[in-house]
A protein has these predicted regions:
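Short coil turns that connect the paired helices of HEAT/ARM alpha-solenoid repeats
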Residues: 13-19, 44-52, 79-85, 112-118, ...
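Structural detector for internal amphipathic alpha-helices that build alpha-solenoid repeat scaffolds
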Residues: 1, 19-34, 52-67, 77, ...
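Amphipathic alpha-helical scaffolding segments comprising HEAT/armadillo-like alpha-solenoid repeats
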Residues: 1-12, 33-47, 66-80, 99-112, ...
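Short terminal alpha-helical segments
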Residues: 6-14, 23, 155
């Protein structure tokens, strides 16, 4: 590997222009897969002080087998990046890594409780995309329905749609969110998710009917969407409600 070329590519990881960073990242991923020299240089760069960005280096190293603890920590830290596209690129990579390195799942679960608002949301989406069916990750999502930040609660409510375990617990928690949450976006997300899983309870149907007839346009819209979903899935339930 030409040393000058490698030095230039690694220097581009500090460039303020994202297309330049992406081009360097794409080249370095291919080179690092074939060269121990490149991987070693990148691992050294990851721990050097004084650089503008560290996530591009971690992103490259995260594509290699058995990424180091420093790489994983940097990727997790980057879930709080100010730019959404970078956060999403990182969480998708973490999901890929988690399929062979199961310890990542526990780190995502920890972030659901202890991370920043951005980290919590991205960790929730990561758990969602892993399509898990275990008690610990389910509890992390259910607990996130009570997070102080409404955007985290919305993420949890929408992500519970993918769960195929704990149906009763999921439905009960979503119903409480729909009935009691102070934020309309959370209530809307809970209603739509709840309309997509299992049989609707009488309490849920009553609440939807009341909301669909309310003067609050946001509540009415959310209830109407949920009722339309239920009518497709459970037409008998909706027909019975309308006869009351």
């Amino acid at each position: 590997m030409d040393t000058d070329r490698l030095t230039a590519l690694i220097a581009d990881l500090d460039h303020p222009d994202k297309p330049t960073i992406r081009a360097a990242v794409d080249q370095l991923i291919g080179l690092a897969r074939e060269s121990v020299q490149v991987r070693t240089a990148l691992e050294q760069r990851l721990v050097e002080l004084g650089h503008r960005d560290y996530w591009p280096v971690a992103y490259v190293l995260g594509h290699l087998p058995q990424p180091s603890g420093a790489t994983i920590r940097n990727l997790l830290d980057t879930l709080d990046h100010r730019e959404p596209d970078i956060r999403w690129a990182i969480v998708l990579l973490l999901v890929r890594i988690a399929k062979t390195e199961s310890s990542i799942i526990n780190l995502l679960i920890e972030l659901c409780e202890n991370g920043t608002t951005n980290q919590k949301r991205m960790a929730i989406y990561g758990l969602r995309d892993l399509v898990l069916n275990d008690v610990v990750s389910l509890q992390a999502l259910l607990s996130s329905l009570s997070d102080p930040d409404p955007t985290v609660r919305v993420a949890a409510a929408t992500s519970l749609k993918n769960r195929t375990d704990g149906d009763e617990r999921v439905r009960a928690a979503l119903l409480q969110s729909y009935l009691l949450d102070a934020d309309i976006k959370v209530r809307s997300a809970a209603a739509v998710t709840l309309a997509n899983i299992g049989l609707p309870s009488e309490e849920f149907l009553r609440a939807l009917k009341e909301a669909s007839e309310s003067d609050n346009s946001q509540s009415k819209k959310a209830a109407t969407v949920a009722l339309a979903l239920l009518e497709k899935r459970e037409p008998a339930s909706i027909a019975g409600m309308r006869q009351r």
